Amino acid sequence: LDQWRELNKSPRWSAFHFYDQGREIAERCVRAPDTMRAIRLLPQPDVALRSPTAMFSVLQPKTRIPPHTGVANFRLVVHLPLVMPPHCGFRVGGETREWRIGEAWVFDDTIEHEAINDSDELRVVLIFDLWNPHLAPEEREMVRAMTAAARAYTG
């Protein structure tokens, strides 16, 4: 999509994935054992080839991630700021909040959201998935089964 043109194959926005679309990247997980220990204590979705996702998201100075949406609300996304200089912003829907180090923002990423680093310094956020707490265990299993069936059908 044209909205991503400036960031495609650009070091201006990068991610260090621990989990990527449901696949653990073991050699990266061992590099952040405390982070992984904490994430593994949380109710993460386990939907084959979809979730969980966990990463350090790095946004270079004077860089904007354009408005975008996720594709599934069976999960919520957590943004936990780790390195947050002044003049960084994050918007979900019509709500913009001030970042506070150590305070997570949990949201449904099917709602349009964007991030801005208007500072002269690097911004780092830990991003990871959680099961949507409104889903009962039976509904979670239906999400897994439906996703697996769709993957089998589409190849």
Could you say what each language-model-derived stretch is?
Residues 1-69, 74, 85-88, 135-155:
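Fe(II)/2-oxoglutarate oxygenase catalytic core
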Residues 82-101:
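A short beta-strand-loop-beta hairpin characteristic of the jelly-roll/cupin
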Residues 98-112:
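Conserved metal-binding segment of the jelly-roll/cupin
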Residues 65-68, 89-91, 107, 113-119:
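Short beta-strand His + acidic residue motifs that chelate non-heme Fe in jelly-roll/DSBH
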Residues 77-81, 106, 121-136:
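A short hydrophobic beta-strand segment most commonly corresponding to one strand
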Residues 87, 112-114, 131-135:
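Short Gly/Pro-enriched loop/turn and capping motifs at secondary-structure junctions
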Residues 51, 75-77, 85-87, 110-112, ...:
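Active-site lining segments that contact anionic ligands and/or coordinate catalytic metals
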